[in-house]
């Protein structure tokens, strides 16, 4: 039963990661109001972060309980751990910086403010981390057993 639950959790986490990335693209491509698109995408990514936190903790604990210290020799374990670190860095590190830059720019749009360059830099870092997390998610799918 725990094995099947871990497969369901992997499916939920990986699906949410990939779907949020696709949804963010569609939001920015479709909506003329880029601030609204950013707000909606941010909410999606926040939800996915919490899914990731819960999923990672379950998968890591399950792996250690199932394999003991041998779990530390598995690519699956390390992929989940790195994904967890990326979620933590993104949600509790990078996102607050982006939010701070947006609020400092008010009432102007951050992209039309003196904070635009810093925002673009941090947003780029967040994008690279997210893509890396999505690639590691592929490792989870391939290594799940």
Language model: regions and residue ranges:
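Cytoplasmic juxtamembrane regions at transmembrane-helix boundaries
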Residues: 67-81, 145
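Interfacial loop at the N-terminal end of multi-pass membrane proteins
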Residues: 1-72, 100, 106-116, 120
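Transmembrane alpha-helix boundary/anchor motif
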Residues: 22-23, 89, 93-96, 139
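Transmembrane alpha-helical segments in integral membrane proteins
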Residues: 59-67, 130-145
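Membrane-interface loop-to-helix entry segments
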Residues: 47-49, 124-131
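Hydrophobic alpha-helical membrane-insertion segments
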Residues: 13-14, 78-93
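Short helix-capping/hinge motifs at transmembrane helix termini and TM-loop junctions
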Residues: 32, 66, 94-95, 144
């Amino acid at each position: 039963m725990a094995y099947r639950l871990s497969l369901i959790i992997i499916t939920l986490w990986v699906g949410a990661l990939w779907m949020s990335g696709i949804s963010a693209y569609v939001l920015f491509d479709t909506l003329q109001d880029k601030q609204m698109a950013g707000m909606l995408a941010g909410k999606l990514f926040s939800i996915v972060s919490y899914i990731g936190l819960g999923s990672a903790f379950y998968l890591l604990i399950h792996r250690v309980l199932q394999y003991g210290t041998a779990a530390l020799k598995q690519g699956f374990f390390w992929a989940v751990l790195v994904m967890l670190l990326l979620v933590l860095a993104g949600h509790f590190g990078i996102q607050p910086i982006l939010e701070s830059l947006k609020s400092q720019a008010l009432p102007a749009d951050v992209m039309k403010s003196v904070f635009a360059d810093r925002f673009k830099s941090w947003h780029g870092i967040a994008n690279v981390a997210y893509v890396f997390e999505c690639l590691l998610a592929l490792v989870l799918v391939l290594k799940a057993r």
